[in-house]
Design a protein with these regions (language model features):
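Bacterial Sec-dependent N-terminal signal peptides
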Residues: 1-26
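Acidic, contiguous N-terminal accessory segments
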Residues: 17-152
Length: 152
């Protein structure tokens, strides 16, 4: 009897591991709301664009992220203060609380909205967690897919 229970418990554990929910992302802290979409955004070499009204510290955080992605992906990303409809787009949304951000990832663009440096930093940290762990490396990482799952 004990052996049957033990085998059933092991089988249940194995089955539950195999039925992971693909409608989530693995980030900490987990966002208040996430809607996973089909497809992905190719981050390697994507341009980084920011609204001209962003403060210098926020622009520097964006430039640092672009530089790190360029380094590890081996594909250069440009950074500018021009309006854009493709690539990484960082805009100011003063209606959001200081540490809040919104992140909308489509196949053509990643739109980040925040009202402060803290919000932009948290959004960047979320995106880094969605990329391969090699995003934190110090050299080009061969054979990695630098994509972000489409979500909002």
């Amino acid at each position: 009897m004990r052996r049957s229970f033990f085998i059933a418990a092991i089988a249940a554990a194995v089955i539950s591991c195999g039925t992971a929910n693909d409608n989530t992302i693995s980030v900490v802290p987990y966002p208040n709301e996430v809607n996973i979409k089909g497809g992905s955004f190719d981050a390697a070499g994507a341009g980084f664009h920011y609204a001209p009204e962003l403060d210098e510290a926020s622009v520097n955080a964006i430039k640092a992220f672009a530089g790190q992605l360029s380094l590890v992906s081996g594909t250069e990303s440009t950074v500018d203060g021009d309006a854009a409809t493709k690539g990484f787009i960082f805009t100011l949304d003063t209606a959001l609380p200081e540490e809040a951000y919104t992140l909308n990832i489509s196949k053509k663009a990643v739109t980040v909205k925040a009202s402060s440096l803290r919000g932009f930093n948290y959004a960047i940290q979320t995106m880094k967690q969605m990329l391969p762990a090699e995003i934190f490396g110090k050299a080009k990482a061969e054979g990695k897919e630098w994509t972000l799952q489409c979500a909002e």
